[in-house]
């Protein structure tokens, strides 16, 4: 790695430690030319598939969009932010595990519903009512009945 102080090409690693529950590596480096020390962080770059929307428009996966949709459904519900983050990470892992370069938005919606069903049934119904475009109270009742099975 190039030295950020003198831009020399050669640096050496003095110390490496796992941080963030093993999800990244913190390295202390020293420049072999000017002897300045600096810290770098190394994380795996996990490429998310692109999202194919129902109108065939393709867009990059947007974690913030996923999070805001879930938080909207979970508003004023007794679910911790840690549980929400775990659910988001689970969805992202499932999307990466497909091995596909593109995934339909419908798949993401179904994965969100699956996670919300585990987290909070009311949030699940809220999300499903918008996602599936419930037209009347009968459709709500049918979905609630399916939850009770």
Curated annotation (Swiss-Prot):
Cofactor-binding details, from the entry = Binds 1 zinc ion.
Q: Which InterPro entries does the entry link to?
A: ATP-cone_dom (IPR005144), NrdR-like_N (IPR055173), RNR_NrdR-like (IPR003796)
Q: Which cofactor does it need?
A: Zn(2+)
Q: What Pfam families does the entry give?
A: ATP-cone (PF03477), Zn_ribbon_NrdR (PF22811)
Q: Where are the zinc fingers (unnamed)?
A: 3-34
> What domain of life is recorded for the organism?
Bacteria
Q: List, for all copies, the residue spans of the domain called ATP-cone.
A: 49-139
Give one GO term, molecular function aspect: zinc ion binding
Tell whether DNA repair is among the UniProt keywords: no
Swiss-Prot/TrEMBL keywords: ATP-binding, DNA-binding, Metal-binding, Nucleotide-binding, Repressor, Transcription, Transcription regulation, Zinc, Zinc-finger
Q: Which PROSITE patterns match?
A: ATP_CONE
GO terms under biological process: negative regulation of DNA-templated transcription
Q: Where is the signal peptide?
A: none
Q: What does this protein do?
A: Negatively regulates transcription of bacterial ribonucleotide reductase nrd genes and operons by binding to NrdR-boxes.
Q: Which PANTHER family match?
A: TRANSCRIPTIONAL REPRESSOR NRDR
**Which family is this sequence assigned to?**
Belongs to the NrdR family.
Q: Would you tell me the protein name for this molecule?
A: Transcriptional repressor NrdR
Organism the protein comes from: Escherichia coli O1:K1 / APEC
Gene designation: nrdR
